[in-house]
């Protein structure tokens, strides 16, 4: 039987799958481990000046770690999904702009590290690269953990929102310790005010609701079961922020990162063939 030629998009998606599959351990473990070392060395001013918190190296590393998630979701991006993801990008910029200008909903804070080009001199242009994967990774992990319970909206959405907030409970203390940003009023949770997490409940609820409507959940779950690397970006999250939190003694945040690692282990996502 003659082989059927894939359309250009299909060929690109298959090629991206192959690149990620062949380099899973490097992308999901080596990159975040090196990233953690580089960030900690930058925080201690141990690197040559231009390399300390180099924004373009940082963005390159983050983009590489996002590849498994991008490759995993790409075949599911219909026109409806694209509109939803575009809306989420706009929402990310909007709520961050409001937050910086008013201190609501996260609390008053300022960036302390160059995160690349800024929009209006205030909001990082790469913000969706940081925000959206938190929501998508939480959504995917919860689909696996909940199983058939994920069919119930009243269960699925609150659990995913809780997972997103839990991820920020692991991330924000590490980011503050590194000096990525600082809250004017501080906070007893490793320098982070609880108002930040109240804000995250709000922003996560909106983002999860949009994502839930944008993606076909049945097709997403089917792809998730077939695509072994689809949650590797969450593996990177556990490695990177777990290491940083341990270094600074943020033990609760480190344990939360480890909890997500446990979720990955329970769902059989720590498998890196050919490493």
Language-model segments: residues:
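Aromatic-rich, lipid-facing transmembrane alpha helices and their immediate juxtamembrane interface loops
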Residues: 2-275
């Amino acid at each position: 039987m003659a082989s059927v030629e894939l359309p250009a998009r299909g060929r690109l998606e298959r090629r991206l799958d192959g690149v990620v599959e062949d380099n899973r351990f490097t992308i999901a473990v080596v990159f975040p481990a090196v990233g953690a070392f580089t960030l900690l060395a930058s925080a201690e001013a141990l690197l040559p000046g231009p390399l300390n918190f180099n924004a373009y190296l940082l963005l390159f590393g983050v983009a590489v770690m996002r590849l498994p998630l991008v490759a995993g979701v790409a075949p599911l991006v219909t026109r409806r999904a694209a509109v939803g993801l575009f809306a989420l990008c706009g929402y990310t910029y909007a709520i961050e702009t409001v937050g910086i200008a008013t201190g609501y909903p996260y609390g008053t804070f300022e960036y302390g590290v160059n995160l690349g080009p800024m929009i209006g001199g205030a909001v990082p242009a790469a913000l969706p690269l940081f925000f959206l994967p938190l929501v998508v990774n939480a959504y995917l992990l919860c689909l696996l953990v909940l199983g058939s319970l994920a069919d119930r909206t009243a269960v699925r959405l609150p659990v995913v929102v809780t997972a997103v907030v839990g991820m920020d409970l692991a991330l924000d203390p590490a980011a503050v310790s590194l000096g990525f940003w600082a809250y004017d009023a501080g906070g007893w949770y490793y320098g982070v005010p609880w108002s930040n997490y109240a804000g995250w409940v709000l922003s996560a609820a909106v983002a999860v609701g949009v994502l839930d409507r944008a993606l076909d959940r049945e097709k997403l779950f089917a792809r998730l079961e077939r695509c072994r690397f689809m949650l590797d970006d969450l593996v990177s999250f556990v490695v990177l922020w777990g290491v940083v939190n341990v270094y600074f003694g943020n033990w609760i945040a480190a344990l939360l990162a480890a909890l997500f690692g446990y979720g990955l282990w329970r769902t059989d996502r720590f498998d890196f063939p050919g490493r």
